[in-house]
Curated annotation (Swiss-Prot):
GO terms for cellular component: plasma membrane. The lineage of its organism: Bacteria, Bacillati, Mycoplasmatota, Mollicutes, Acholeplasmatales. GO terms for biological process: phospholipid biosynthetic process. Its main location: membrane. Keywords: Cell membrane, Lipid biosynthesis, Lipid metabolism, Membrane, Phospholipid biosynthesis, Phospholipid metabolism, Transferase, Transmembrane, Transmembrane helix. The gene is plsY. It comes from Acholeplasma laidlawii. This is Glycerol-3-phosphate acyltransferase.
Length: 233
């Protein structure tokens, strides 16, 4: 097997394993002694943690989920200095693949029976590693929308969609990727990566289908609406 392909496969597996770390399960279990899978939407993600336990535990979970989406790309692109892992050729960057692997790990975590969250924070974290301004704007937008509407699901979908739009606009003004030393990333490569990002966003939106139904029925829980009694105090 070509060594480049082997390294890419190894990096994808490692990215998945990092993304699969279930902070949405660990934090409620560690600090409140509860299994988040038995509360709220029973989803293992920062959205459910924020809804069930409030901002004190939801925000750290969200940030850690972001971090695990960014970490694989940061390690491979900037710390290891191994361009052969994210370049198909001299100008084709595939680093978003590792962020996508982390997002899939979050959705289907091997550590908790292939259950997980909806990959909003993890996907945004991957974007931060590529373009911090757009990624951080996505996080800011999430909190603004979520806390103004009191619906985490609305904040998640709006932020995810907005990040994809901002990334596409970035391509048009040719400011999408952070430069990698001594490498020139092609415009075509940017388009390929943006298609991948768009597919991730579509997956995130699809994962919220039950939330859309509850919103239409008026049964979607608001932030802090149904905190667990005697636990959140």
């Amino acid at each position: 097997m070509n060594m480049q392909i082997l390294w890419i496969i190894i990096a994808i597996i490692c990215s998945y394993l990092i993304g699969a770390i279930p902070f949405g399960y660990i934090i409620p279990k560690l600090f409140k002694g509860i299994d988040i899978r038995e509360h709220g939407s029973k989803n293992v993600g920062s959205t459910n943690v924020l809804r069930v336990l409030g901002a004190k535990y939801g925000i750290p979970t969200f940030l850690l989920d972001c971090f695990k989406g960014a970490l694989p790309i940061i390690i491979i692109r900037y710390m290891l200095g191994m361009p052969e892992l994210f370049l198909i050729s001299d100008t084709y960057d595939i680093s978003i693949v590792f962020g996508a692997a982390a997002a899939i790990g979050h959705i289907k975590s091997i550590y908790i029976g292939f259950k997980g969250g909806k990959a909003v924070a993890t996907g945004v974290g991957a974007v931060i590693a590529i373009n911090p301004i757009i990624g951080l704007s996505g996080i800011g937008l999430f909190f603004i929308v979520a806390f103004s509407t009191k619906y985490v699901s609305i904040g998640s979908v709006v932020a995810s969609f907005s990040v994809a739009v901002m990334m596409w606009i970035g391509v048009l003004i040719k400011e999408i990727w952070i430069p990698v030393p001594n490498l020139t990333i092609s415009y075509e490569s940017q388009i390929i990566n943006l298609v991948a990002i768009s597919l991730i966003v579509l997956l995130i939106i699809y994962m919220h289908k039950k939330n859309f139904i509850r919103l239409m029925n008026g049964t979607e829980n608001k932030i802090g609406q149904k905190k667990i009694q005697n636990i959140t105090k």
